[in-house]
Every structure is written in structure tokens, then in C-alpha cells.
């Protein structure tokens, strides 16, 4: 199976002694970085609803994107958000990382689609950004059906018809489902609360990363196998599930123990 996850806003730029690969859409990343480079700090601040300090940081990054003075890092280890706490890519063994190179993809506003070891440069460009290009008024328009098509090609290469979607709605919306020839399975993660089961953003993001790791480590090949997911105290919750959306629930006791 293929699994997709979102990137992260935060980066960990610690140097890693790992061989990297070249992103498939590097030319597009340069094109988009040039478009972002033309924007003022105020424009970037408005584009991504970020602070003045973050706008300056990313304006400076886009100015030197092609020179890459800060070097490059493997994507799965450079991203440092909630999903990546769950993924824990730094502790994956070499064989599992090799497997993930073929079976795990990271959706990206700038790079389109990344393998775990693809080399990235420091950036922030969220998929929902309305960055105008010759292809349209947003990154969704820019990428069009190409990310779905790339997933189709990779799915064929690993002989699967299933895509495990562990990405956010914002990022998975960049995958044109009409162009996707795969069955989509989107796990949902709930916390048991006094008022009933509830999706809590931080925990759900972390669980999506943990699910991505679970699929890679166990080399899962069928969607029913993900129902055994138990990382962090979650268990399959049939009553909360829907077709294509298996649910997992964590009890209050498991929450406290985590």
C-alpha cells in the first residue's frame, strides 16, 4: 500500500548523515520559490497568516532558495510537527526507511510530492496558500491532477491499489480524486471524553504519523491489516467507523498512560 502524510510548519535542521534523493518535482519547487520570492514580507504574512518575524524568515529563505546556503536535509527527518512526533523517522531502521522510500509519500505545497529521503531546503509554503502562478490563483490550481497521477505511477510500481490517507484535509485536497486510480482509506482517531468520543487535533496528527510508521514497519499490504493498529493505546472502534474511514479510539486510561 501507499501512505501519504502532510508536511510540517516546523523544521529540524540538524545535520543528518544520510544519503538523500532528488525530489521528482524539483523544477516546480524552484518555479514556486521564484514566485514567492517576488512577494514582499507583508504579502507573505497575508498569504499564510503568519507573524511578521515568520514572514521575514521565509522571505529571506525564498531569496536564497536556489543557492541553498543552509544546505538540504532528508524530508522525513527535517519536518518536525505533530505528525512527525508520531512517525519518529529518526528511529526507523535502514530496511524500513528503504521500504518507506517506495511506500510513503509526503504532500508539500512547494515540492508537490516527496519521498522520505528526498532532499529539501528550508521553506514554509502551505498547500492552502493562494499563491498566484500562470496556472491559476492557488497551489491547488498549480498542481492540478499531477500529484494524483504521480501516486498512480508509484502505486503501480509497488503493485497496490490502496492509498492510506494520513494527511490533513488541506493537503489531501491537492490530490485530484477524479484522477486517482486508487482506493482511499482515511483513518480517523478519537479520544474518549466525558461527553463522548472526540477528535483532538494534536493527538490525531500524532496518531496519523504513528499509523504511517505502523504501515511501513509491518510492511502492510491490505487495508484490513491497519485495524490492528494499537500504538499509543488506540484500538479499532467499529461503531465510529464508516466505509473507507476506519476509526480508532483511545480510552481515558490510555490517554493518561501515554
From Swiss-Prot:
InterPro entries: YaaA. Signal peptide: none annotated. GO terms for cellular component: cytosol. Pfam families: H2O2_YaaD. GO terms for biological process: response to hydroperoxide. It comes from the Bacteria. NCBIfam families: PRK02101.1-3. Belongs to the UPF0246 family. This is UPF0246 protein Jann_0444. It comes from Jannaschia sp. (strain CCS1). The lineage of its organism: Bacteria, Pseudomonadati, Pseudomonadota, Alphaproteobacteria, Rhodobacterales.
